[in-house]
Amino acid sequence: MGIIEKMRLDGKKGFVTGAARGIGKCTARAFAEAGADVAIVDLDIEEAKKTAQELQELTGRKVIAIQTDCTNKEQVDAMVKQVVEELGGLNFCHNNAGICINAPAEEMTYEQWLKVININLNGIFLTDIAAGKYMLENGGGSIINTASMSAHIVNVPQPQCAYNASKAGVIQLTKSL
């Protein structure tokens, strides 16, 4: 049996946040190509629907779109419930939603700082907890959180203090689960 066969996800169900485009879209595609049913979770519901349709046509898997603000606990809880109901379970999640605001620390506003930390770190916490509770009650699962090399290495000058701090937080949060 080759490595591709060993990595099959046939019958698995999961979601990817920030999946309408970019890294999230690529990982959702990889999960679907490996045999999983996937929810495309994003704030931009129109792009999420396009991605879901594209991946469903490409892979033949069940792919749905769910609009969710990952910084809103009620929306995150409702999203996890919807994934379970529409896909028939939850075996994995990939928390990928994130933003970067480029501004030197001395020019960044507190509101900008909070926005980055809220989406990149608090959003992952909320999603990890909601998905993790379901997984623990139902035999386990896998949680993947997108971090960044910027959590470890800061190229000077790099005007991304909130982004770097948020991604370092994601690494420590993930280790603490």
Where are these regions (language model features)?
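The beta1-alpha1 cofactor-binding region of Rossmann-like NAD(H)/NADP(H)-dependent oxidoreductases
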Residues: 45-46, 67-78, 110
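Conserved NAD(P)H cofactor-binding loop of Rossmann-fold oxidoreductase domains
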Residues: 96-101
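Substrate-binding pocket helix/loop in short-chain dehydrogenase/reductase
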Residues: 104-105, 112-117
